[in-house]
Amino acid sequence: MTITTDTTLLHDPRRQAALLYWQGFSVPQIAAMLQMKRPTVQSWKQRDGWDSVAPISRVEMSLEARLTQLIIKPQKTGGDFKEIDLLGRQIERLARVNRYSQTGNEADLNPNVANRNKGGRRKPKKNFFSDEAIEKLEQIFFEQSFDYQLHWYRAGLEHRIRDILKSRQIGATFYFSREALLRALKTGHNQIFLSASKTQAYVFREYIIAFARLVDVDLTGDPIVLGNNGAKLIFLGTNSNTAQSHNGDLYVDEIFWIPNFQVLRKVASGMASQSHLRSTYFSTPSTLAHDAYPFWSGELFNRGRASAAERVEIDVSHNALAGGLLCADGQWRQIVTIEDALKGGCTLFDIEQLKRENSADDFKNLFMCEFVDDKASVFPFEELQRCMVDTLEEWEDYAPFAANPFGSRPVWIGYDPSHRGDSAGCVVLAPPVVAGGKFRILERHQWKGMDFATQAESIRKLTEKYNVEYIGIDATGLGVGVFQLVRSFYPAARDIRYTPEMKTAMVLKAKDVIRRGCLEYDVSATDITSSFMAIRKTMTSSGRSATYEASRSEEASHADLAWATMHALLNEPLTAGISTPLTSTILEFY
């Protein structure tokens, strides 16, 4: 067998002519190159249909011819082998194109497409932050924090225990949520958030989730477990039984509103007892009688220390603590008033307007971090704290986010209308199932800037949400307008006319219910607590009889929530909770 060594052109002139034609040569040029007659080449073109051959088929025949020439070449160079490999890959690619033209399946063109949906694919880590995301979070954190918040950050780097007394609404919970997420990502330490109630603890969770979304990370789970290092973000109410088993950095908010704080502190402090962990306590002030005040003042540290050398004296005045101070008991303390926050870059307040909206005493308590002496209050904090419960954990029959949160069980509504621009208060009260049982405040609302019709409409919506059995409304003065509108859709509504005698009856009823521990509301509802604490016993203008009044402030709003609660409680007789000895009944037949 004779093997050709001519690799330039095939010996079949008819095939050579076709390949040259597809390269762009004309019929006369091809005839001259092959030394053939022009009519012969023209005849081949017409008979073989060179023009009708698809472009991909032309390339395939050209590849085949060239590859065949290289394969039968006896002595191949390195360049020949490279070209053979290249041509082989091109033939494979053309084969995929042909399959795609028949099936329309993109996977025939690109094999990687078929691998995209394979089960063996590695799943992305849950709650995972890339290095770039963490860097961006840090940048956002420092750019969006006020100066006084960055002071808290620096203190946290140096001190194990931070104790902060603060004004309302200066962004402490917001800030510490962000700080804790970054600390968990960097250190791997668990972050524990302990609040007055589980509902309040979830405020931390909402802020953390929103912070993570700024870098396109969706955090899920309760607790949230970070995919980077396994650190947990744990959100707890004040149930010490659930708190004691955890370990990590601790954040406790609103400590001056937590009932039985000393019991909780003993358990909670153990969660951050290791030297590399830290504890942060922060709160607005409540009353000097609160359990947390000795912890703040240093009195708790001195208990059991008889020696004068062991005892400490801590100046907890604003002058001493405005800039933050490491005190002798090892705690770093700071007081941040609303004026301090303004100096620290928080320009969200109009202080002069707040002073106009609040009495001098109320402004000092709400915004200047001064404690209230509740000795003159009809309802001292010591009594009210027995009413505070973690409703999310203890009220299993109440679903706050359902269309009908309390099902078909009856509720009572108490309403204190808006007077002269202050807010209107409304409570939804669940009466006890049995005589002498507990009342529960399911909902409370404070509405400001509403006219009579809007106030009445707000009550009407509550009647659609609950099985309302009773509505009590203060119909004194301007309140009569709301009462008349409510009676149009709820004819059984009761109008309550304020007199010294009526106020006394309401206060005595509420006092009895609270004294017996028969009122419950969520521990995070500090506005209810403040509202009751604002009520004082005074004399009427004539000086002939005693009555009950409250300071008028934007926050306590003349104790509207307390009065609204008492309007609802009035549906039960004053003697209903008084236990009476069992008596026998005699039935006579005549």
Swiss-Prot record:
Annotated InterPro entries: ATPase_terminase-su_N, P-loop_NTPase, Terminase_6C
Pfam families: Terminase_5, Terminase_6C, Terminase_6N
Keywords, comma-separated and alphabetical: ATP-binding, Nucleotide-binding, Viral genome packaging, Viral release from host cell
Nucleotide-binding is among the record's keywords: yes
Domain of life: Viruses
Entry GO MF terms: ATP binding
Region of interest: Disordered: 105-125
Family: To phage HP1 protein ORF16.
Summary of the function given for this chain in its UniProt record: P protein is probably the ATPase subunit of the terminase which directs cos cleavage. The Q, P and M proteins are needed to package DNA into proheads and for the conversion of proheads to capsids.
Stated name of the protein: Terminase, ATPase subunit
